[in-house]
């Protein structure tokens, strides 16, 4: 059974995010922009996530809700992603999600486009 936690090993720190921004590839989809870096090693904790949410998205309440929805979508679907992947996700101002299902679909759609999903699904 996959671990559904979102501990320190699942998060990107600022130096790791800088590395993803400089060395990773960029993808756009469903109101999201993602920088993706495929690391050589596959650590036991799998994929890692970093979020970059700008003020253009709205008030703090809206920005924090978007971050919560994206973290939850990543947390529950991390086992579907290829291990050894670092993601930095930046929601664009046009994204209008009604709730978790929309955020989940946007994240999985982006991962599908970037070929980050494990094939055995």
What are these regions (language model features)?
Residues 1-121:
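Positively charged, solvent-exposed patches that mediate nucleic-acid binding
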């Amino acid at each position: 059974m996959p671990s559904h936690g979102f501990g320190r090993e699942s998060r990107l720190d600022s130096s790791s995010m800088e590395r993803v921004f400089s060395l990773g590839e960029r993808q756009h989809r469903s109101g999201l922009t993602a920088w993706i870096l495929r690391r050589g090693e596959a650590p036991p904790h799998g994929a890692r996530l970093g979020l970059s949410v700008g003020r253009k998205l709205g008030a703090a309440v809206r920005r924090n809700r978007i971050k919560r929805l994206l973290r939850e979508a990543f947390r529950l679907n991390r086992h579907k992603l290829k291990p050894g992947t670092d993601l930095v996700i930046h929601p664009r101002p046009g994204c209008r999600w009604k709730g978790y299902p929309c955020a989940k679909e946007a994240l999985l759609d982006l991962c599908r486009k970037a070929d980050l999903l494990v094939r055995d699904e």
